Amino acid sequence: MLRFFQMTWTTALYFLVFLSFGNSMPQKSKPFWLSADINSIEWQEGCLTTVLCSHPRFQLLKDLLPISERASISWPVTEQFLEHTVAPFVSYWPSGRIEDVSLSAQVVGVDTTYGFPRTCDQTPAVRIFPVDLYELAPESAENKTIHLKAKCFEATITVTKHVERCPWCPDPQEILISNEIPQQINLQQSALESGIHSFVGIFYKSSTSESLQVGICLLAALAFFASLAFIIMLSVYLKSKKSSRRNVSVNVQPRLIPYNSRCDDYDTRYDMPWDQQRPLTYWMSKSTVTSPNSLRSEAYQTYRIPPPPNFAPPV
């Protein structure tokens, strides 16, 4: 009898363990995205951990524990750290479970004494969406606020999970379905037809189709008269422009050529021998120099015709 109870309890225990493992077995993993926004960071003044760290950078780490996959991002620590520098940290995970992703923060920099990179301060890793041990199911909330505390700082971070689509992808419910577009076009056409029918009905009572035809004819006539008026105005403008050009008096002054006294001498410029225009110097001997003018005067005196004799009787 005692052995029977022992076997019964053992069987029941194995059955419960099997059910628990069956519920906790991982389902088919799907890709998902996690976006983290830093809400606030409080720094402790005079903390020795960060004082001995030069060029500090605040770093966020996301770890997928079963496959040891990590995504990280860092920003330089400045006075206006949260206002201008920090941006949402979006990470993509092609496989795995959201419940296995943990979040941590740390301050990295360079050692002031030896100059090697070091981790100045860090927080313990915290699971973002842990599994409920009682229900064996992950949390259903899409957003969760996590507080990370280290020796010299305390950060508040909001993490959002995206399972169906990426954070920047549009919502399919907000996009118009192709079947709804023709319906909207039909509604617009019916509204236009009703407006034309009501306008034509003021002057002429008719059906909707007749009102539409009358409205189209009126619009065509209006377009014809508008184009005709434009052509008339253009022709009048061109004619007025031509007449204004004809009436303009053109004042043309004759071109006055200045008088040049040297023009009268152009016909007689060859009367003077060429050797007299630019007289050259002649060297008669080594000691005397005679100009061509003097030679010419002597030649004229030597070969000049003598005057006729005088036959007057003596007194």
From Swiss-Prot:
State the Pfam families in the record: C2_nem (PF25330)
Domain of life per record: Eukaryota
Which InterPro entries does the protein's record reference?
A: C05B5.4-like
Name it: Uncharacterized protein C05B5.4
Which taxonomic lineage is given here?
Eukaryota, Metazoa, Ecdysozoa, Nematoda, Chromadorea
